[in-house]
Amino acid sequence: MTKNRTSMADIASHAGVSTATVSRVFNGVGQVSAETRRRVLTAIDELGYDRPTPEGAPDTPTIGIIVPELTNPIFASFTHYLQEEVSRAGGVCLICSQTPGATSEFDYLSSLVERRIDGLIFVSGRHADLLADLTPYANLAERGIPFVTINGARPEVPAPDFSTGDALGIRTAVTHLLELGHSRIALLSGRTHIVPALRKAEAFTQVMAEMLGDHSPIIEETFYTYEAAAARTHALIDRGVSAIIAGSDLQALGAIRTISSAGLSVPDDISVVGFDDSFLMSHLNPALTTIHQPVQSIVTSAVRSLYEALATTTHLATHADYVFSPDLIVRGSTARAR
């Protein structure tokens, strides 16, 4: 953008601020609140101008966000809100998305550290894998680089974790199905060396024993993908289940496909509950009953914690768990048992 007087005035008018404030945002000098900066940047975007280049500007931290594949809508949702929240706080994001067989989380981490990243956010990463080597996280703490994790609390990781209450979500889903008269309930979830999947399986086992006296509940472990869940659902149909709780919305969609392919109906023959409440789940036919992850609340708290560390030069090198309560969203994929 050419910072002539006319364009600066346009932006100032659009944002409801003075031209001097716009100039401070462009030049990275002076005191500008995060909210005012956001309004100025929004005005720049809406008017079609180029944003000021952030490199070299003071008080503009660069935050690395490492997420799994964005083809899973829940990870796309986390990424969207993280980028929005970091931008609102006056930072710049470097987003690294993993895909199977491509660049790994720790490869991304090495590259970001070389770029002198100011802080890091890991979403459902290796920190959530009970089989993973956690040394890179310890190295981050030793370097004094603040970071937080999302959805995968492990006490060995020296950073705060912000996660959905998986156990409460599963308990809520089972209770809903029991109220509908179901007793042949199965859990279709992820591999239990992944912390959220383990929490779901543990909660399912406990609540089925408490409420039904079932000490050997039906649990199918597989990958958190549409295809893997579709394949595993055949076994659940063969075992005569009347309801399936999936560990993710993608798994729920895979289960529904297999149920339909078998000539059965959701929810008339088999009820299905998802987990995430990701984008478009309310627009399916039938709309998916699911456990809603409080993504925005998790993101807001995680980013606030990271920025507090950046502001105080505290390195967050102590583990802490922050658990956020999920909600059951009842839609059309569950019904009374026959």
Language-model segments: which ranges?
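Hinge/beta->alpha junction and helix N-cap segments in small-molecule ligand-binding domains
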Residues: 35, 67-77, 95-104, 126-129, ...
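Flexible loop/turn connectors
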Residues: 235-338
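N-terminal helix-turn-helix DNA-binding module of bacterial transcription factors
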Residues: 1-59, 338
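N-terminal helix-turn-helix/winged-helix DNA-binding helices
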Residues: 3-7, 41-80, 89, 100, ...
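Short acidic capping loops at alpha-helix termini that bridge into adjacent secondary structure
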Residues: 183-184, 214-217, 266-271
